[in-house]
Regions:
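Generic structural motif
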Residues: 3, 126-130, 178-180
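C-terminal non-catalytic interaction appendages of large macromolecular assemblies
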Residues: 136-141, 146-150, 154-200
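Secondary-structure boundary/capping signal
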Residues: 24, 75, 178-179
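N-terminal, charged low-complexity regulatory/assembly segments
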Residues: 1-67
Length: 200
C-alpha cells in the first residue's frame, strides 16, 4: 500500500528536485527508507500518537536526517523549519480569514479546550495540566510532548523548535481581541509549554 504523502515529504521532494537534481533519486530513496524504518520502530504507538508521528514528527526527522547528506546540519534544520513555517503561515491566513465572521473569535478558546482533550491528550503522549478552561480563556501547561520526546529520542532535540515555532506563527495575531501567549516550551529547553489563548 502506498504511503500517504505529508506536506513534509512533498516539500522534501521539491527541495531534492530543485536543489540537488543529480542526487534527487538517491535522496528520495534514502528518505523513504528512513521514514519506513521510523514508522516500523513506532508501529506500537497508540492511534492517537500515530496521528502526530505520521503527519509531522517522523517525516520531519526523516527529512532532517536525509537533507544532511547534501547540506550542512544547520541548513538542513532551517530547510525543515521552512517547510513547517510555510504550512503554519497558510493555516494562520485561513484561520484569520474565518475569524472575520463577527463574534466567531469568542469561540476559539473553547475550541482549543476541546482539541487539547481530544488530539493533545494523554493517549497521544502529551501531559496537559489545565489551569483555566472557561470564560474565554484556555490556559494549559503541557508537561510532556511527543514532538519533544521523539525528537530527543532520535538525537535531534533541536528539530522540535520547528514545531514550537509553528504554533506561534499559526496563532499570533489571529484577531485583535484574541491573545495568544506562550513564554516557555519543552522544545526550547524549558520544563513545560505554558499555552494561553484568551479573549480580551
Amino acid at each position: 500500500m502506498k504511503r500517504k504523502e505529508t506536506y513534509l515529504s512533498r516539500d522534501f521532494r521539491e527541495t531534492a528536485a530543485l536543489r540537488f537534481p543529480a542526487q534527487a533519486k538517491e535522496l528520495n530513496t534514502a528518505f523513504d527508507m528512513r521514514l519506513s524504518a521510523l514508522l516500523a520502530e513506532n508501529a506500537g504507538a497508540s492511534k492517537e500518537k500515530q496521528y502526530h508521528l505520521k503527519r509531522q514528527i517522523l517525516p520531519g526527522i526523516a527529512a532532517y536526517e536525509t537533507l544532511q547528506r547534501a547540506m550542512p546540519k544547520e541548513e538542513a534544520l532551517q530547510t525543515v523549519h521552512g517547510y513547517v513555517e510555510r504550512l503554519a503561515r497558510t493555516s494562520h491566513k485561513q484561520l484569520a480569514a474565518l475569524l472575520h465572521i463577527p463574534g466567531l473569535y469568542r469561540l476559539v478558546p473553547g475550541v482549543f479546550v476541546k482539541s487539547t482533550r481530544s488530539v493533545f491528550g494523554l493517549a497521544a503522549g502529551f501531559a496537559p495540566k489545565e489551569l483555566q478552561t472557561g470564560n474565554g480563556v484556555w490556559r494549559v501547561d503541557m508537561m510532556k510532548c511527543p514532538y519533544h520526546d521523539t525528537c530527543a529520542e532520535y538525537g535531534c532535540p533541536e528539530l522540535c523548535r520547528c514545531f514550537c515555532d509553528s504554533d506561534d506563527i499559526s496563532y499570533t495575531g489571529l484577531h485583535p481581541k484574541l491573545i495568544w501567549e506562550r513564554s516557555m516550551t519543552l522544545g526550547r529547553g524549558n520544563d513545560r509549554c505554558d499555552f494561553c489563548m484568551e479573549v480580551r
